[in-house]
Amino acid sequence: MKLPPKITRLPIVWELRKLTLYKLSVIKTVFKYKRFSIIRDSFVYFPIWWKLQQRKNEPLKNDRPWITFSAEEFLRKILRKDMVVFEYGAGSSTLYFSRRVAQVFSIEHDKKWFDHLQHEFAKQQITNVVCRLIEPEAIDENSENNYSSDSPSYKHKTFESYVKSIDAFPDKYFDVVVVDGRARASCITHAKSKVKPNGYLMIDNADRKSYFKGNDFLFDETEWRVFDFVGAVPYQFDFAQTSFYCYTPNR
């Protein structure tokens, strides 16, 4: 039976719905990955997940990147004040990094979001972030496009300039490179050589196989150690995977 709209808007109904969706995500993720540690972690991170689901929460105010909770714990342990970070995709993670490392370079494709972030940087007096707006460019529908986005919103658009922005930096320059924006498969290809020895390439939503299209061969197991973190994510019901590729050429 479908409940009347007034009933579904009641706070208790909304809270029960959130709890149900969280449980379903736990079950679905356990079956997908066959990892029972996901059940343990779902209890550990449930209180903070629940708190961040409150309607008045603003992601830019919470000092928490939009990655799995277990990945954020790992990230907090590896970051140092002398590090330099590059990000494809600016947002709450940019603010998070700015408080923990020396310098952050971020690339954003959406002008409205970019303008909002610029206001937030000024408001919070953040001075160690260089954030650039690089919007996608229109191309002919028959043109070959190796820098496309999976999103239908960007059909017949190329993110070539966006992806290649990291090429302006020397190889092995960054301690951490974050791939959490558009055209991720291409971003991974260009970002790999920019990671320092013992540095990290962080890929959010790494469970989406399309992001690794053509990139599987890039990560030689003798040079890259992989750390996968599967579980709950702030502000959303679906669980996800965040992966860190640590560049260890001399091990």
Spans of features found by a protein language model:
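Membrane-proximal basic amphipathic "stem/tether" segments
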Residues: 1-66
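P-loop/Walker A phosphate-binding loop and immediately adjacent motor/lid segment at beta-alpha junctions
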Residues: 38-45, 50-52, 100-103, 120-133, ...
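Short, basic, glycine/proline-bearing loop/turn elements
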Residues: 56-61, 78-79, 173-177
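Short, flexible loop segments at the rims of nucleotide/cofactor-binding pockets, characterized by
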Residues: 61-66, 82-85, 152-157, 177-180
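SAM cofactor-binding core of SAM-dependent methyltransferases
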Residues: 69-141
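Short, contiguous clusters of charged residues that form electrostatic/catalytic patches at enzyme active sites
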Residues: 69-73, 95, 160-164, 172, ...
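S-adenosyl-L-methionine
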Residues: 118-171
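C-terminal substrate-binding/active-site "lid" region of AdoMet-derived donor-dependent transferases
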Residues: 166-171, 176, 181-251
